[in-house]
């Protein structure tokens, strides 16, 4: 079995997978598995109220959310994907409060990282992706660092390397403001 198949199997069975993204390593799980989401939040020491990002292997995974925005905004969002840009979109798929942080929105991205996109594509839909770090600590940028900190806490570490970005993704709102800006 290939590494990506092991990772997908872990996700489908409610596990947590560490994997590389554009600028940092991430922790992923099935967005419909409340137990897995709780585990990620516990591992990170992260508050449920912050919400989590969903990454998708293709733009079509976010069609329902994109139907809720203006045609001009949809063009802008689609032009930024795949890319290092997360967008705060209407929660059209009714993801749980564990994903949305209790808001009526969902953070969505199609990453500019082939392995991260492929993980979602092989899974068959969006997956949770949050930085592999303890809340308030620096994001991890190497597989060795992830193995040192998370090997006993996750179900699978997908071998790989981050892309060329310098940190976590930019986070954009529909009104044009930026909640987080990355140098990458």
Residue ranges of model-derived segments:
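Active-site-adjacent structural elements in enzyme catalytic cores
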Residues: 1-184
